[in-house]
């Protein structure tokens, strides 16, 4: 389980472990009045934390077949001017990750106008830099069922906005190793974000569906 914006002080994540029955966890405390990350896992997983910061937790573990697996849990910076720093950090992590690599979290970044619903036309800033990062890292977007948008603001007038900020990307090697993966975007209920529920090892899919590979090219337009 990966939580963002926990706003917890150091060592306060222990309470989350107890409430959710996790064996172990790792946290990044808040800075000032915002931020904070928490990652918890079940007893059957041996997770090795390799890198942690206020925007990214990188871990290594073995999948159910015993193959090495890398996962990066992302919290994109809310400030557009500082978001590039997160992409640079992600690139540095790629240099030490296994080819079997998954990236998941709140990237705080749209890729196109299709990721946004609102009553006012607005420019999608930062999309090109994000696309180029995904292209250089050779990451493919993973299909998710459920809700199209994963975040909404609190306005009830024509300033109301819904966006798709939470998503998952993976290397081709990860996709080939987990052909029956499932991601589902949950409804937005008690927070301004909806959670992503994932299952990497579905053994008996209800139907065989082809994977829609969405490699992001340099020529993609916003």
Task: State the predicted function of each range.
Residues 1-222:
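A shared catalytic/ligand-binding motif for oxyanion handling
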């Amino acid at each position: 389980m990966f939580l963002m914006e926990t706003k917890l002080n150091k060592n306060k994540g222990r309470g989350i472990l107890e409430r959710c029955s996790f064996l172990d966890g790792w946290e990044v405390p808040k800075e000032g009045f915002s931020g904070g990350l928490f990652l918890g896992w079940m007893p059957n997983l041996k997770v090795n934390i390799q890198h942690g910061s206020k925007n990214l937790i990188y871990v290594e573990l073995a999948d159910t077949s015993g193959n090495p697996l890398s996962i990066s849990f992302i919290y994109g910076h809310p400030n557009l001017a500082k978001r590039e720093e997160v992409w640079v950090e992600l690139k540095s992590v790629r240099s030490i990750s296994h080819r079997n690599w998954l990236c998941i979290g709140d990237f705080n970044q749209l890729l196109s106008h299709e990721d946004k619903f609102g009553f006012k036309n607005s420019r999608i800033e930062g999309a090109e830099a994000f696309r180029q990062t995904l292209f250089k890292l050779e990451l493919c977007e993973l299909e998710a069922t459920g809700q199209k948008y994963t975040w909404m603001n609190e306005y009830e007038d024509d300033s109301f906005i819904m966006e798709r900020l939470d998503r998952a990307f993976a290397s081709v090697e990860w996709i080939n190793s987990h052909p029956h993966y499932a991601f589902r975007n949950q409804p937005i209920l008690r927070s301004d974000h909806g959670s992503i529920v994932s299952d990497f090892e579905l053994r008996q899919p209800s139907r065989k569906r082809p994977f829609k590979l969405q490699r992001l090219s340099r020529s993609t337009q916003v």
